[in-house]
């Protein structure tokens, strides 16, 4: 059976996995960031990440006001088959924690790119933000790297309800 791929306009879909075009990705850790109009960035787990983890049962998130370094955990997720950190993709300060995912981590399995974001971070400076974003996959590069990752792990994305 051939691989399933579609261009949905604002996102690509490959093997059932959504890859929104406007996001920056850490492919290895399967975490994304979106740059917001107010200068903050929103961070969450990718569709591939939530599929690999399985139904998420627990989340521990660093509190608002915590200063984070790129690569250091902003949260820890746990499912029945996996537990691991969610790294910050930019240096800055946590300015908001999503109460929906704290109350029900499984929400990430349902809507990983929408209302199920994990934290919002105010970057330390424009310079550090530019530096940090330049080290992430974006656009066509993200699309190709994500497809390679999906193929290597033989993933077909599903959203757990």
UniProtKB/Swiss-Prot annotation:
GO cellular component: cytosol; glycine cleavage complex
Details of cofactor binding: Binds 1 lipoyl cofactor covalently.
Nucleotidyltransferase among keywords: no
Top-level taxon of the source organism: Bacteria
PTM-bearing positions, type N6-lipoyllysine: 81
Role description: The glycine cleavage system catalyzes the degradation of glycine. The H protein shuttles the methylamine group of glycine from the P protein to the T protein.
Co-factor(s): (R)-lipoate
Annotated InterPro entries: 2-oxoA_DH_lipoyl-BS (IPR003016), Biotin_lipoyl (IPR000089), GCV_H (IPR002930), GCV_H/Fam206 (IPR033753), Single_hybrid_motif (IPR011053)
CDD domains for the chain: GCS_H (cd06848)
Biological processes annotated in GO: glycine decarboxylation via glycine cleavage system
Claim: Plastid is one of the keywords in the record: no
HAMAP family registered for this protein in UniProt: GcvH
Keywords: Lipoyl
NCBIfam families cross-referenced by the UniProt entry: PRK01202.1
Protein name: Glycine cleavage system H protein 3
Protein family per UniProt: Belongs to the GcvH family.
Subunit field text: The glycine cleavage system is composed of four proteins: P, T, L and H.
Annotated ranges, domain Lipoyl-binding: 40-122
SUPFAM superfamilies: Single hybrid motif
Pfam families recorded: GCV_H (PF01597)
């Amino acid at each position: 059976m051939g691989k399933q791929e579609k261009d949905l306009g604002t996102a690509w879909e490959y093997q059932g996995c959504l890859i929104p075009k406007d996001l920056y990705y850490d492919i290895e850790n399967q975490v994304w960031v979106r740059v917001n109009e107010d200068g903050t960035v929103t961070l969450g787990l990718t569709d591939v990440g939530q599929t690999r983890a399985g139904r998420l049962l627990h989340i521990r998130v660093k509190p608002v006001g915590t200063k984070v370094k790129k690569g250091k955990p902003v949260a820890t997720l746990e499912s029945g088959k996996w537990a691991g950190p969610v790294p910050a993709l930019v240096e800055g300060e946590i300015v908001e924690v999503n109460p929906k995912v704290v109350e029900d981590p499984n929400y990430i399995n349902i809507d990983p790119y929408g209302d199920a974001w994990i934290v919002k971070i105010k970057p330390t400076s424009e310079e550090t933000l530019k530096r940090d974003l330049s080290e992430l996959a974006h656009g066509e590069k993200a699309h190709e790297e994500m497809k390679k990752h999906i193929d290597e792990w033989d993933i077909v994305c599903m959203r757990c309800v």
